[in-house]
Amino acid sequence: LCIMLGANKNKTDLLKIYHDLPQKINVEEPKINKDLRLINALIQVESNGNDSCIGDRHLIIPSVGCLQIRPIMVREVNRILAILGDNTQYKNKDRYSHEKSIEMFLIWKNFHHKDHSNEVIARSWNGGPKGPLRKRTIHYWYKVQKELSKNSKDSLGI
């Protein structure tokens, strides 16, 4: 897991991120393990574990960080936190933080996709709210599936 995440992260570090989040991200251990596998796969597809990765340079505002987060996602996460009564506010520079990127992903995922499949979550992450309906996200999902199959439970220590 440490190598795959591109930093000295292990399962304990990632579980700490989970438990340090606000109480609204209250998830059972088996669900956390599933989320961690998906997060790892998304990080590999999005940035190959590079927290400084800058993508979509052809756009006015690029996506950045290990999960290739755009400013609109930072705003969405802050909106979710406000709805949930949490005063935490993320900044665009937080996209470069491995931990904060994962936190933002989990807040978004647990608000919009709490009980959805990995496919719906991944395709929405890539293509927005209508991602699962867009043909262009199918190839992205195949790449995520490939990473998920590489990262068996044994290799993650789960």
Kindly give the residue locations of the regions a language model identified.
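Hydrophobic membrane-insertion alpha-helices, especially the h-region
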Residues: 1-6
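Catalytic glycan-binding domains that act on GlcNAc-containing polysaccharides
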Residues: 10-158
